[in-house]
Regions:
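Glycine-rich flavin
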Residues: 2-6, 22-29, 34-154
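Residues forming the Rossmann-fold NAD(P)(H) cofactor-binding site
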Residues: 18
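Glycine-rich Rossmann-fold phosphate-binding loop(s) that bind the pyrophosphate
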Residues: 12-15, 36-37
Length: 154
C-alpha cells in the first residue's frame, strides 16, 4: 500500500494536538491526525472533564440538602453512584464526539492507532486493520505526558 502524503501529521489528539491539526487545516495545509485511543485525549476522556462532571453532581447533591434555605422542600435526597459515573462518561463521550466532528468538518484525515516515526517525514501507524504509512513535510508531536512513577508508591 502506498503511503498517504500530507503537509502536516499530528500525533496525538488531545487538546494540543487537535487544535494544532485544526489550525493547520484552516491555513490550507493537508493534515492528518493520529490518535491511539480517544479523540480529545486523557483530560477530556478520563481526567478533567469527567471529574468535573462528577463534582457538579456532588454540588447539586449538596445544594439539594440546603433547599430549605431557598424556600424549597426536597425530601428523600439520595445519590446513585452508578448513575453519577454514567453521566460523567456521557459528558466525556459527547465532547469527544465534538472533537471528532471538528476534525471531520476541517477535512483532517483521522487515523486511529499507535504511531512511530521510523524516518524523517515518515509516520507508521499500527491500526486495527494493519499498518498505515503516512508521509509529511512536518510532524507535530502532541502525545501528552505521563507522571513519573516513583519507587515505593506501588
Amino acid at each position: 500500500m502506498a503511503a498517504k502524503s500530507f503537509d502536516v501529521v499530528v500525533i496525538g489528539a488531545g487538546p494540543g494536538g487537535y487544535v494544532a491539526a485544526i489550525r493547520a487545516a484552516q491555513l490550507g495545509l493537508s493534515t492528518a491526525i493520529v490518535e491511539r485511543e480517544h479523540m480529545g485525549g486523557i483530560c477530556l476522556n478520563w481526567g478533567c472533564i469527567p471529574t468535573k462532571a462528577m463534582l457538579r453532581s456532588s454540588e447539586v447533591f449538596h445544594l439539594m440538602h440546603r433547599a430549605e434555605e431557598f424556600g424549597l422542600k426536597a425530601t428523600g435526597v439520595d445519590y446513585d453512584l452508578d448513575a453519577v459515573v454514567k453521566r460523567s462518561r456521557a459528558v466525556a463521550k459527547q465532547l469527544s464526539s465534538g472533537v471528532s466532528h471538528l476534525v471531520k468538518k476541517n477535512k483532517i484525515a483521522a487515523v486511529m492507532g499507535e504511531a512511530i516515526i521510523p524516518a524523517k517525514g515518515k509516520v507508521k501507524v499500527t491500526t486495527d486493520k494493519g499498518i498505515e504509512e503516512l508521509t509529511a513535510k512536518s510532524i507535530v508531536l502532541a502525545t501528552g505526558a505521563r507522571a513519573r512513577e516513583l519507587p515505593g508508591l506501588e
